[in-house]
Amino acid sequence: MSNELGSTKILVCPADAVRKTNEAITFDSSPAGLITLKNKAVSYFVNVDANETNGNMVLIGDRNLLIAGQSPTSTGLTLPGTNLLQWNHDIHKLRGNVARADGSVFSQIPSIQIWTNHNNPVRLAIP
């Protein structure tokens, strides 16, 4: 991951006060490293099923999700069918940011539909 990202700073949203206090400095296992801090140093969920063949799929987004009006209770979430993602008050006051697999970005939106990949469930990794 360090070869692709270049810096750990892009893993934390500047508006995410909780994660900002745990911001990783390096990708290693030092006390301030991402390996040590793990999810405490990441502000964004990742759609592990997104790929470049379906550019409309949501790839990443702000972690403070609401799904069917509820916050996820685990770090791994499987969503069948089409789902509406929304956000709670924690970071951007009921709004969120997402990037799709095609590189497009949606900023400060109140909700977005997330679709399955050819009728397969969507799996989200949520810090």
Per-range role (PLM):
Residues 1-127:
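Short, well-structured segments within or immediately adjacent to enzyme catalytic domains
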